[in-house]
From Swiss-Prot:
Name this protein carries in UniProt: Orotidine 5'-phosphate decarboxylase
Cited SMART domains: OMPdecase
Alphabetical list of NCBIfam families matching this protein: pyrF
Top EC group: lyase
SUPFAM superfamilies membership: Ribulose-phoshate binding barrel (SSF51366)
Length: 278
C-alpha cells in the first residue's frame, strides 16, 4: 500500500479524492492538532462538558471519538449538543461503533434505531470479519441518493488493534487494505498501529492516500491490566499515524485541558518532524 505520510496535511487535502478526508486535514491544519480524544464517559453532561471549548478540550482536538451506546441518558439533546459544539468549534465526530455483522443488520444499526448514527457521526468504523459485504452495505447507506450527508460521512476499517494478543494481523490486515481500495469515496483509511505501506496486498493506484488513526496513545502509561498497550505521540506519528487517539491519558488526567494541550503540542511537533517542517 502506498503512503503519503511524508506530505503535509495541506498538500494531502488539496489532492485527496475523499471529501471528508479533505475536511479532516483542513481541520488539523487550522487547529494545528492531530489529536482525537476518546470520550469514554457515561453521561451526556460529561460528554458535552468534555467537548465544550469554554470548559473543555474543544480548542485542542481535531476529532472527538464517542462510544454513544455507553451513555446512560442518551437522547436527542445529546446529539443536538454535540453537533452544535462540533459545528461551532471545528471538530469532527467519530462514533467508535465497530460495526461487525451482516450487511442488512449494519445498515439498520447505522441508519435506524435509537442511535441514528448516520445523522450525526462524520466517521464510523467497522471490522471486515463478516467480509466485504459490511463495507458495501455501509457505503450504500451513506451514499444513497436520499441521504443528505453523503459527502460528510466516511469509514475507517479496523485493520489492527493495540490490545495484547489481537488477532487483527496478517491476512486480516491485508484483506482490510484490499477491501478499502474498492470504496475510495467512502473508506477514509484505517485504525491501525502503523502505516500499512508495507502490507502485501493488491497494487495501489497512484492517487491512493489512506488516513491512519492510531489508538492507545498515552504519555504516562505503557499499558493497563486488561491488555491495552500504549505508545507515545512521537512513536505513533513516527510509525505513520496521521491522527493519534488518546482516552484516559487525557480525560482521566488531573487536568484534562492541560493534558490535551500537551498531546496537541507533542502530536503536532511529531507531525512537523515527519514532514520535514521542523
Amino acid at each position: 500500500m502506498s503512503s503519503k505520510s511524508q506530505l503535509t496535511y495541506t498538500a494531502r487535502a488539496q489532492s485527496h479524492p475523499n471529501p471528508l478526508a479533505r475536511k479532516l486535514f483542513q481541520v488539523a491544519e487550522e487547529k494545528k492538532s492531530n489529536v482525537t480524544v476518546s470520550a469514554d464517559v457515561t453521561t451526556t453532561k460529561e460528554l458535552l462538558d468534555l467537548a465544550d471549548p469554554s470548559t473543555g478540550l474543544g480548542p485542542y482536538i481535531a476529532v472527538i471519538k464517542t462510544h454513544i451506546d455507553i451513555l446512560s441518558d442518551f437522547s436527542q439533546e445529546t446529539i443536538d449538543g454535540l453537533n452544535a459544539l462540533a459545528q461551532k468549534h471545528n471538530f469532527l465526530i467519530f462514533e467508535d461503533r465497530k460495526f461487525i455483522d451482516i450487511g442488512n443488520t449494519v445498515q439498520k444499526q447505522y441508519h435506524n434505531g435509537t442511535l441514528r448514527i448516520s445523522e450525526w457521526a462524520h466517521i464510523i468504523n467497522c471490522s471486515i470479519l463478516p467480509g466485504e459485504g459490511i463495507v458495501e452495505a455501509l457505503a450504500q447507506t451513506a451514499q444513497a441518493t436520499d441521504f443528505p450527508y453523503g459527502s460528510e460521512r466516511g469509514l475507517l476499517i479496523l485493520a489492527e488493534m493495540t490490545s495484547k494478543g489481537s488477532l487483527a494481523t496478517g491476512a486480516y490486515t491485508s484483506a482490510s487494505v484490499d477491501i478499502a481500495r474498492k470504496y475510495p469515496s467512502f473508506v477514509l483509511g484505517f485504525v491501525s498501529t502503523r502505516s500499512l505501506g508495507e502490507v502485501e496486498s493488491t497494487e495501489a493506484p497512484a492517487s491512493e492516500d489512506f488516513v491512519v488513526f492510531t489508538t492507545g496513545v498515552n504519555l504516562s502509561s505503557k499499558g493497563d491490566k486488561l491488555g491495552q498497550q500504549y505508545q507515545t505521540p512521537q512513536s505513533a506519528v513516527g510509525r505513520g499515524a496521521d491522527f493519534i487517539i488518546s482516552g484516559r491519558g487525557i480525560y482521566a488526567a488531573a487536568d484534562p485541558v492541560e493534558a490535551a494541550k500537551q498531546y496537541q503540542q507533542q502530536g503536532w511537533e511529531a507531525y512537523l518532524a515527519r514532514v520535514g517542517a521542523q
